Structure formats: structure tokens, C-alpha cells
């Protein structure tokens, strides 16, 4: 499933994605092969970036492409009753887009409906990338407290 967000007047808003839009965050949760192929073609991202992104056994790393960067991290996932595991979260940065890819909905990524206290600006992709990493770290530290 592909969901697009864009910062409009300092608010993170859900928008319908158009390849001509710049400064958009595309949130992919359990993407289908068709969605991956469509996005790889329209956003001009190497298809192998998406294969690495959805490989659950892949290790965290950063891959540099010609016009994009892929960062793969592991984030904590709650399985209830104080049981935690990790799940890969892949972040692709292009000049116009920030794309996050995960197998399941991850709380590390702020949802526009949650009224996040942090001001998220999707047009500032480097800052947005570091905010995603910060959220992952915060959730990880909260998870450790319950172990």
C-alpha cells in the first residue's frame, strides 16, 4: 500500500501522489511487486533498491545510487506482553522524494493523524531522514525499558 504525505503550511497532510510533486514522503507498507515496479519506473529508482528494501534477512546498511540513497535500519516492533522483535525499515532518498518501505506499519514513522509534536517538513529531506532515525531511536530506548 502506498500513502503519500506532504508538508503543507507546517502540517503533514495526506495527498494523492503525482510524480510531478516535489517534497513528498511516500510511505510503502507491504508493497506489491506491481507497486514496486510502478514506483521504480516513475521515480527513476533502481529496482534492486526495492528488492534490498523488502528483504527481511538483509543487514542494516547504506547504498549509494546515481541519484538516490538507500538506508536500511532495523526498528523495534512490539509483539504484545513486553515481547519485542525487529523489522527492517528502508528509507530511499531522491532529489524529490523520501520513500519509506516496511513490511508492516511501524510506529517509528509519525502518522499525520497522531498529531506529532515534532514539526516534520517533507521538503527538507535530510532533516526528515534524521527525524525518522530519531524516532526509531526513541522507540528502541522505550522498548529497552520494558525488557
Regions found by a protein language model. Give the residues of each.
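Peripheral, non-transmembrane regulatory/ligand-interaction domains of membrane transport proteins
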Residues: 1-147
Amino acid at each position: 500500500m502506498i500513502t503519500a504525505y506532504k508538508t503543507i503550511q507546517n502540517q503533514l497532510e495526506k495527498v494523492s501522489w503525482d510524480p510531478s510533486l516535489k517534497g513528498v514522503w511516500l510511505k510503502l507498507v507491504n508493497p506489491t511487486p506491481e507497486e514496486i515496479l510502478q514506483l521504480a519506473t516513475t521515480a527513476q529508482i533502481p529496482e534492486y533498491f526495492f528488492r534490498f528494501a523488502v528483504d527481511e534477512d538483509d543487514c542494516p546498511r547504506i547504498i549509494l545510487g546515481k541519484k538516490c540513497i538507500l538506508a536500511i535500519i532495523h526498528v523495534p516492533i512490539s509483539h504484545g506482553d513486553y515481547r519485542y522483535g525487529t523489522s527492517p525499515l528502508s528509507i530511499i532518498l531522491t532529489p524529490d522524494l523520501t520513500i519509506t518501505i516496511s513490511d508492516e506499519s511501524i510506529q517509528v514513522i509519525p502518522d499525520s493523524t497522531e498529531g506529532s509534536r515534532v514539526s516534520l517538513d517533507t521538503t527538507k529531506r535530510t532533516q526528515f531522514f534524521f527525524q525518522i532515525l530519531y524516532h526509531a531511536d526513541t522507540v528502541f530506548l522505550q522498548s529497552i525499558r520494558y525488557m
